[in-house]
Each structure stands twice: as C-alpha cells, then as structure tokens.
From Swiss-Prot:
Organism this protein belongs to: Kluyveromyces lactis (strain ATCC 8585 / CBS 2359 / DSM 70799 / NBRC 1267 / NRRL Y-1140 / WM37)
Keywords: Cytoplasm, Nucleotide-binding, Protein transport, RNA-binding, Transport
GO BP of this protein: nuclear-transcribed mRNA poly(A) tail shortening; protein transport
The keyword Transmembrane belongs to this UniProt entry's keyword annotation: no
Compartments it resides in: Cytoplasm, Cytosol; Cytoplasm, P-body
GO CC annotations on file: cytosol; P-body
SUPFAM superfamilies: SAM/Pointed domain
Superkingdom of source: Eukaryota
Subunit record text: Monomer. Binds to RNA.
Polar residues: compositionally biased ranges: 1-18, 314-336
Function: RNA-binding protein involved in post-transcriptional regulation through transcript degradation.
Encoding gene, per UniProt annotation: VTS1
Name assigned to this protein: RNA-binding protein VTS1
Ranges for region Disordered: 1-33, 259-336
Length: 459
C-alpha cells in the first residue's frame, strides 16, 4: 500500500518531459504556462521559496540557448555562399542574447543568493569591460580578415557603405592617413580597370523589387546587389562599343576645316594666286618682247608699272573667284536670277578686259586695267551716286575714310577728283594708303564723268 501511495503521488506521464516528442525543445514544458504550473503543483514546490528550487532549470535554459544559437549559425551557413564569410557572429552582434535566461533565473534563486550576487559588483564590472575589449578586438580582427577575403568590387561596396556611416572626424583623419601614405610612396595610386566585365544584374533587381528586405552588410554581399543604391545601373556588356577602350570606334563629328565649302573657297584662293603668278610672267615677257631696244631705265620703269598692274589684276581675279563662290553657294530666288546673271557676265567681261590689258604696254591700257580693278573693289556705282557726291563726308565714309572729312569736306566733288598725291598730302591726308585709295576713287569718278555716266542732279 505504501508503494501504491508513492506512485499515486508522482505526476502522470502526460506531465513528464520524457513524454515529449524527440524534436521538441527540452525547455518547452517548463516555458509553457500549463505545463510549468502543472509540474510545480505536482511536485509541490513554490517557485519563490528558497528552500525548494529545481537545480536543473539553469541547465535546461542554457541548453535551449545553445541549441538556438547553433540553429541560427546553421541557417546563416546554409544561406550564405561558400566564398562569403560573415564577419561577426550573432552572439557578438547581440551581446545581450546570452543573458536571455536572467529573468527566469530570478524566480528560482533565493533572496540570499541574489544579495550575495549583488555584492561583488565592481569586480563583475571590470570583468565585463575586459570581456568587451577582448570581444571588440576579436571583432576587428574578424572584420579585417573578412575584408581581405573579398574581391575588389566587393571591397569597394563595403567601403561605400562604411564611408556613408562614419563620422566626419573619422573621415577627415582617414583622409589625412591616406594622403600621408600616398605622399610617402607606401601606397601608389592605381588606375581603375579598363573594359572590365560587369555582370548582368537584371534578374537580381527584379527579385529585389518583388521581395523588398531591409539591407544590411550580409544581405548586400550575399545577394547580387553589389553596387551602391544611388549609383547608375550597370549596362549590359554584350557589344564592345560600350566599353571605354573602344571609344575611338565611335562617330566623331566632322571638323569644320573638312567642309566642302571651305575646301572650295581655299581652292579659289589658290587659283587666284596661280593667276597672279602667271599674269606676272606674261606681263614681263610681253614687255621684254615689245621693247628690245629700250634703255635700262625705261625697261625698269615699265617693269615696275607692269608688276603693279599685274598684282592689282591678281587681286582682282582673287576677288572675282570669291564673288563667284559666294554666288554659287548662295541660295537663289527667282527674283535674283537676272541680277546674278548680269553680275556673272560683267565679271567675265572685266576679266577678259584685264587679260587684253596685259597684252599691251601703253599707258592707256594700264589705266583701263586699273580702272577695272578699282571698279570691282570700290563699287563704282556707289561712288558715283549723286546723293553721295553732293555730301562729301558721306562719300568719304563709304570709303571708310571719314576721319578726313574735316580736311576734304570743304571742296566740292568735281574739284576734289582732280587733286593729286602732293595736294592731298598738303591738305592733311598723311597716310600713304589713304592717299592711294582716294586717288583710285578719284580716277573712277573722273572716268564716269568723262563718259557722261553721272546724273546731272549731282552738279
């Protein structure tokens, strides 16, 4: 009977932790409210009484914490690729996780033991500081080893994330250290890789858009998003034209010097120079053949006159070529076709007259060639305008010689055109170029007046 009473006083098998399934945690019954209260009632113990306390409670909680930590480590190791190593463990990242059973232990501890545990507080504080320093040193060493195992692109990503979270003073001191290392020659600046292959990140970006998760160091490096969030998306490198080293194959804008209009214009200038040289040779040969018995003085004078006339003719031909190029390249309207045809015929006539003038030696032909040259360069029609002839300052302004208006504006135009070089110099026209320009304009107006081509309203 006594043995039966003892067996009846023991708790049933439904309340025993031995009856739990094999995969359950060992402290599940103790942590559950029903199971823990039933066990305590069956055992007849008070959780707060110091006389009776379960000695195996701390062991079970420690085993539970150890199993949780091991499962978390296994999950991290299975979800992480083989070449990626986590720099910090879960216990290091969460130092308070190991003290998760502190709250439960308070119910099973006697008050005397709690008082004894509170007495050596400075010693525990110093031990905790030492443990924190050791843990910090270990974490730093693990972080350095982990960074050394990364690829350059992954190291760049880590540095981008670190720099954005550092303090301004730390960034400044880091910059000073880098500058000192570079200037001392310990670290030499290196150029980035050229045409390095960039992996395609389209699938990873779609996956991240479907499953948004909070970013941390492990998720950034374990996933495919190894680029900064604010950086532009990498381009697909299927074609070699997108690489920097193939930039020389890209289309380059055509320079203005290779334009056909400029080439044609330069060709016109070269043809004008060629005409000038050929005209000089023709003039000299014609002079030598027409005056075989002349003296040296007369021949030299004629040669100088012919050289001046031929140079003027060369300038005239160059101007003609430029005008022709402008007329050819200018878009023409139906109203301007007749004017262009008239100008072309007049240019052809003047060029033929200049060619005829080069074949003769007398002074009349040289005067005609000079007249044709100045006629084209000074716009004879504008010089013989009656309104300009009446207003001598305006006439001088059309020649860009308006600064001599005070010296020459007092004389009428029909007296002014008969002045020579010496008279102009005496009147205050000291520049040789200005006097030559005025003499050419005077000769044009005199020619028009002799042919009665000036309107009578100008007198």
């Amino acid at each position: 009977m006594s043995s039966q009473n003892m067996l009846s006083s023991l708790p049933g098998r439904t309340q025993s932790p031995v009856n739990l399934p094999r995969g359950a945690h060992p402290g599940a019954v103790l942590l559950s409210p029903k199971g823990s209260s039933a066990n305590l009632q069956a055992l007849g113990t008070n959780p707060t009484s110091p006389s009776q306390q379960p000695l195996f409670l701390n062991d079970l909680l420690n085993q539970q914490q150890f199993s949780l930590d091991s499962q978390l480590h296994l999950r991290d190791d299975l979800g992480r690729p083989s070449n990626m190593v986590s720099p910090l463990s879960n216990s290091a990242m969460n130092p308070t996780a190991s003290n998760g059973s502190t709250f439960l232990d308070t119910f099973s501890r006697p008050t005397s033991s709690m008082a004894i545990n509170h007495q050596p507080l400075p010693l525990q504080h110093s031990n905790s500081n030492a443990n924190v320093m050791v843990n910090f040193t270990n974490d730093v060493n693990q972080l350095c080893n982990w960074i050394s195992m990364l690829t350059p692109s992954q190291q760049n990503t880590v540095m981008d994330n670190l720099l954005s979270s550092l303090n301004e003073e730390v960034l400044h001191s880091t910059k000073l250290k880098l500058d000192s290392l570079v200037h001392s020659g310990y670290i030499s600046p290196q150029l980035g890789p050229i045409a390095s292959p960039i992996p395609n990140k389209v699938q990873s970006q779609v996956h991240q858009a479907e499953n948004p998760q909070p970013l941390n160091l492990d998720s950034v490096l374990n996933g495919d998003n190894i680029y900064r969030q604010w950086s532009p998306l990498p381009q697909n490198t299927a074609s070699p034209m997108q690489q920097p080293m193939y930039d020389y194959l890209a289309d380059i804008p055509r320079p203005r010097s290779a334009d056909p209009y400029n080439a044609f214009k330069k060709g016109g200038l070269s043809s004008g120079n060629a005409n000038n040289n050929s005209n000089n040779g023709n003039a000299i040969s014609n002079l030598n053949s027409s005056n075989p018995f002349g003296t040296n003085t007369v021949s030299s004078t004629n040669m100088s006159n012919s050289n001046s006339s031929s140079s003027a003719t060369g300038r005239k031909n160059m101007n003609q070529n430029q005008h022709q190029n402008q007329y050819l390249n200018r878009p023409q309207s139906p109203t301007n076709i007749k004017a262009n045809v008239f100008n072309k015929t007049s240019l052809a006539t003047s060029s033929s007259n200049s060619g005829n003038a080069l074949t003769t030696v007398n002074s009349a032909s040289s005067t005609t060639s000079n007249f044709n040259c100045t006629n084209n360069s000074m716009n004879a029609k504008g010089l013989c305008d009656p309104k300009l002839l009446k207003n001598v300052p305006a006439w001088l302004k059309s020649l860009r010689l308006h600064k001599y208006s005070e010296a020459l504006g007092s004389k009428p135009w029909f007296e002014l055109i008969y002045l020579d070089d010496e008279a102009l110099e005496n009147m205050g026209v000291s520049a040789l170029g200005a006097r030559r320009k005025l003499l050419k304009a005077f000769s044009i107006v005199r020619e028009y007046k002799a042919n009665d081509m000036i309107d009578s309203s100008a007198f």
